[in-house]
């Protein structure tokens, strides 16, 4: 069955395995995960738990900042006897009977050796050209060439008379939801509520990440 938790990417470090192997790891801090709602096949058509992460400030009239919860969010969290949450995500195909509304989901949900998928929002790079954004080749930089880093031809002859959708061109790069699959949990620190994940995960430092059981290898 699927397991899941939300956390913040703290950064990268390294640890040593039992055989002395150096392992690069990403530190993910996962605090304040609370089950806000349980969904079942009978009522909702599928099994899932809804998990909230990081508290929001209580409802305040005329508050314009998104740091404050609105009344519907406050009422929804109140059913779980919890504070309103800033981030709410669903984890499907879980053992619903193993969770209760209001229960805290801790890092010991995972153990060392678990294979997981990690989802985050990639770092934003701003407006970039076709070489950096798509890995296209540049032209000659000397010998009279006037073609250096331009994207080259993007259109067709008079038969098509248009640029096809999806043509690789300069534009905004990064800031996309990215999932890295089949990463390994190296260590779980229940005292500091952190998970050490082998390799790197998407997003900047302090970015939100979603950790769940690997969809390909988790149930094998």
Swiss-Prot record:
GO BP terms in the entry:
translation
Source superkingdom: Bacteria
Question: Where is the region Disordered?
Answer: 130-156
Q: From the UniProt record, which GO molecular function terms apply?
A: rRNA binding; structural constituent of ribosome
Q: Tell me which UniProt keywords the record has, alphabetically.
A: Ribonucleoprotein, Ribosomal protein, RNA-binding, rRNA-binding
Ribonucleoprotein among the record's keywords? yes
- The answer to whether UniProt assigns keyword Ribosomal protein to this entry is yes
Q: Single GO cellular component annotation?
A: cytosolic large ribosomal subunit
Q: Which Gene3D superfamilies match?
A: 3.30.160.810, Translation factors
What binding partners and quaternary form does the record give?
Answer: Part of the 50S ribosomal subunit. Forms a cluster with proteins L14 and L19.
What protein family does this chain belong to? Belongs to the universal ribosomal protein uL3 family.
PANTHER family, alphabetized: 50S RIBOSOMAL PROTEIN L3 (PTHR11229), LARGE RIBOSOMAL SUBUNIT PROTEIN UL3C (PTHR11229:SF16)
> What's this chain's function?
One of the primary rRNA binding proteins, it binds directly near the 3'-end of the 23S rRNA, where it nucleates assembly of the 50S subunit.
Designated name of the protein = Large ribosomal subunit protein uL3
